[in-house]
Amino acid sequence: MGSEMCIRDRMYIDNVECDDSCLVGECGKGFLQLMQNFEIERLLICAQALGLAEAAMEDAAKYAAQRVQFNQPIYKFQQIQQMLTDMEIKIVNMQNLLYKCAWEHDNNISIRLDSALAKRYICKSATEVCSDAMQIFGGIGYTTETRASRCWQDSRGWQFAGGTNEVMVHIAGRQIIKKYNK
């Protein structure tokens, strides 16, 4: 389950040795170096989750316009309209939050708080948008025949990568306290 929208293969590396001149950074400090890039990683994850939500939304909206029930396209039903509206609101909010974080990073403003907020909100909302898209498709939405289902699987996985949603709450909580208690 997951990684349905990407090609993946395995690579095994055993007993590898390299010259000190080939090291990136300092030997034994890999995790500390990696931590410096977590915030950027979170933005990249957010961008991918947003893309999944947008793809699922596009497919759901097209399907709702084409699928006919009771002699009318299903988008004319209020429940479908509400779902599409809520999905679009989430997508717009995700875009705004991601663009804000990217702008802050580009302008050398700390994104420790905002990247955690973005990661938690965008990955959670993307999964919700994809879930609603699956619902609009009905039974076929649950199968991997629809892109919406594959998007849901991948978006759900983004809630773990780069730090779980629970870890994002921990990071954001500490930063919020610092922000308001200067």
Task: Identify the residue ranges that each predicted region occupies.
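Short, small-residue-biased leader/transition segments that mark boundaries at the very start
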Residues: 1-7
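Alpha-helical interface subdomain recognition
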Residues: 12-15, 20, 28-29, 36-182
